[in-house]
Design a protein with these regions (language model features):
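Nuclease-adjacent, charged terminal/linker segments that flank catalytic cores
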Residues: 1-201
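Catalytic core segments in nucleotide and nucleic-acid processing enzymes
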Residues: 216-411
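The feature marks a conserved, polyanion-engaging helical scaffold used by nucleic-acid processing enzymes
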Residues: 122-290
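Short coil/loop linkers at secondary-structure junctions
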Residues: 76, 209-212, 345
């Protein structure tokens, strides 16, 4: 961290620093969003319905048939003995599956994969992808056999090693593993929601001003089933918004947010584009070297020049505020270095965050005074103040529309 600011700097930074109540507000709002994310996914996956199907199997299964087919399905007879030894005995379908049941009802794969406490990502990596079958895509006999054997061998070991004491332990295993998957998805969702909270209002504002041409995006879908960073196969789409009514645009954005939109680009009527969450390289033609940058937002004008860029940090945990600032300043410094070494104009820079603790607000204010930053935005403060919201939208429009003068300076 830098030296402590002087008295005048102290006065400046307080307008950006989050109060204790603002931090509590941000944490509450983040907790609600996280809870809704988990609950919506559990509902969409129909976990309760799948569990009811498993319990029905447990009431109807033929113990002798299961014993006959156990080894070919990858089930250890010793594991079945362990379930029989419980008082009362535990039904075999609570932990193990037969291939025929998976063919009949592919959604059961979700249950048995989670009982085995293995992730979709790992299943995909070993050539036994289950993702689409878990939302009812038909499953062939051979693949069902391979999946059943793999999962049953894992669960057999878990049963024999632990005894799995407790009549509801199978449900605990399912929900713990689903929770772990959703938690990983939530960590990615925090950043996506930060983009949406900033970009959607700007898109509407640009449209009202008749300065918006189109948006480019992809959607992740309503359900999180796998590691989305590793399986980022969403189709890129472009929608022309120029000429549409305000209600049409608002309805479209609401529908896209429900499908978990990922904004990629905003195209303005003046020819500028704002690129979002991009990795790009700037080249020095003389040295043949290239420099990688990855701004969260960056304005591109038609001459392949970039007059403005920003870092956007979601998340409400005050313990992470310092790290967010550190990550942002590293990104800023990479952009400055890349611009200097490729003989480009240095972009004006902005920092946006859900909260700013005092230390971060002090440093951000110092960067402003030193001319390193063009603006700093505390998104929770902005959300609480209509006047600040309007000022923020107007500033963003100015940054999005920015051009360069004859000297190469941003205007």
């Amino acid at each position: 961290m830098t030296d402590q600011p002087n008295a005048s700097q102290q006065d400046d930074y307080t307008q950006y620093a989050s109060t204790q109540e603002e931090i509590l507000q941000a944490v509450r709002e983040n907790s609600v969003r996280r809870g809704l994310f988990f609950l919506k996914n559990l509902s969409a996956l129909d976990v309760d319905g799948i569990v009811q199907d498993i319990e029905q199997l447990g009431r109807e299964y033929d113990m002798e048939l299961w014993r006959e087919r156990a080894e070919e399905a990858g089930i250890s007879p010793a594991a079945l003995d362990t379930l029989d030894a419980h008082d009362p005995p535990v039904p075999y379908p609570y932990y193990f599956c037969l291939p025929g049941d998976l063919v009949r009802e592919p959604r059961l794969v979700l249950y048995y994969r989670n009982v085995a406490m293995i992730s979709n990502k790992v299943m995909n990596n070993i050539g036994l992808d289950t993702t689409q079958h878990e939302i009812s895509m038909p499953l062939g006999v051979d693949k069902a056999q391979s999946i059943a054997q793999h999962l049953n061998k894992i669960t057999s070991a878990l049963v024999m090693e632990t005894g799995l004491y407790g009549q509801r332990r199978h449900l605990e295993m399912v929900y713990v593993n689903i929770g772990a998957s959703l938690d990983g998805g939530w960590r990615n969702e925090v950043g996506r929601l930060a983009y949406v909270s900033v970009i959607s209002p700007i898109v509407l504002h640009l449209h009202r001003l008749q300065k918006l041409k189109s948006i480019i995006f992809k959607v992740k879908g309503r359900i999180v089933l796998e590691d989305e960073d590793e399986n980022d196969n969403g189709k890129i789409q472009e929608v022309e918004l120029q000429g549409r009514s305000e209600q049409e645009v608002a309805t479209l954005l609401s529908d896209l947010e429900d499908q978990r939109i990922v904004y990629r680009q905003i195209n303005l009527t003046n020819g500028n584009s704002v690129l979002l969450n991009r990795q790009m390289y700037w080249h020095n033609e003389e040295t043949k070297r290239r420099y990688r940058i990855g701004p969260d937002l960056i304005t591109e004008i038609p001459s392949d020049t970039f007059p403005w860029a920003a870092e956007l940090k979601g998340g409400a945990d005050p313990a992470g505020s310092d790290e967010h600032w550190k990550t942002a300043t590293q990104a800023f410094n990479r952009m400055i270095d890349a611009a200097e070494k490729t003989h480009r104009p240095i972009p004006q820079l902005s920092f946006m965050a859900t909260i700013l603790v005092d230390r971060v607000a002090q440093e951000a204010a110092l960067w402003l005074q030193q001319g390193k930053l063009a603006s700093v935005h505390n998104l929770t403060k902005i959300a609480n103040d209509p006047a600040m919201q309007q000022d923020f939208l107007n500033q963003m429009v100015a940054f999005f529309e920015m051009t360069l003068d004859e000297t190469g300076n941003s205007t």
